[in-house]
């Protein structure tokens, strides 16, 4: 098995590399016995050889490419992406819009560095991954367009527990579409979005360039969504909440709570 990796570049605090969950007890035993790690870039392949850019040749029977996924919404026009607040080329913004967002992000950035000075000193090898040349996503809570209340974008934000994140986003989206959540006035909403974008970029300099990385901010993020939806964010009890992991199963009774708060005709 051939694996391209660079363990030295991965730092958990800065989330500079992908993070996974060990699902099997024998995972590391299998890796240490069966996996050879080669660090480098692929320059080409032949019938049964992978060529690296440093001249090494790696015999192989099969090559698996983990190419990621495309979140560019190809079915939307470039104009629609700008209007909805999805990542787009800055040149598509009007001069006034570009200047307004730049001022908001700069203000948020100064506030963040004043409050968290360490974020101004990331490792030199934490380079942005993806999103080069595009604006960040300008979505309230990483979900809602600031200009069109009829559409939401779920699942774009990256979190350390996507199951919990998905549950919280679904609850917030239900309340929003039911009319039980309203986003702040536009000026305030833009300030909050700019802060979220700037924080994502500073906190996660490699993977936060699109403004939607909440990897170690999972609990804050899901608490915010539930509170805005009028639900209880602390659901286990005064002792268990600070002492036990936050899981998707914490929200298992949210449907009943939602109907109790807003009525049985909603939240279906």
PLM features: residue spans?
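N-terminal FAD-binding dinucleotide-binding subdomain shared by FAD-dependent oxidases/monooxygenases
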Residues: 1-268
């Amino acid at each position: 098995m051939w694996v391209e990796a660079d363990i030295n570049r991965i730092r958990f605090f800065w989330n500079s590399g992908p993070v996974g969950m060990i699902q099997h007890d024998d995972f590391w035993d299998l890796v240490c016995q069966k996996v050879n790690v080669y660090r480098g870039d692929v320059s080409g392949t032949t019938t049964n050889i992978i060529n690296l850019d440093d001249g090494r040749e790696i015999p192989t029977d099969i090559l698996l490419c983990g190419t990621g996924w495309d979140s560019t919404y190809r079915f939307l026009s470039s104009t629609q992406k700008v209007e909805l607040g999805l990542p787009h080329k800055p040149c598509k913004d009007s001069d006034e819009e570009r200047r307004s967002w730049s001022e908001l992000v700069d203000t948020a950035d100064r506030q963040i560095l004043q409050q968290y000075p360490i974020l101004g000193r990331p490792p030199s090898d934490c380079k942005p991954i993806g999103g080069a040349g595009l604006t960040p996503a300008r979505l309230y809570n990483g979900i809602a367009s600031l200009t069109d209340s009829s559409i939401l974008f779920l699942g774009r934000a990256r979190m350390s527990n996507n199951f919990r994140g998905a549950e919280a986003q679904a609850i917030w989206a239900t309340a929003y579409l039911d009319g039980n959540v309203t986003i702040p006035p536009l000026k305030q909403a833009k300030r909050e979005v700019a802060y979220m974008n700037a924080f994502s970029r500073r906190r996660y300099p490699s993977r936060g360039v699109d403004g939607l990385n909440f990897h170690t901010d999972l609990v804050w993020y899901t608490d915010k969504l539930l509170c805005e939806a009028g639900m209880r964010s602390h659901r286990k009890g005064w002792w268990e909440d600070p002492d036990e992991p936050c899981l998707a199963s914490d929200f298992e009774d949210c449907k009943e709570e939602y109907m109790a708060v807003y009525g049985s005709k909603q939240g279906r």
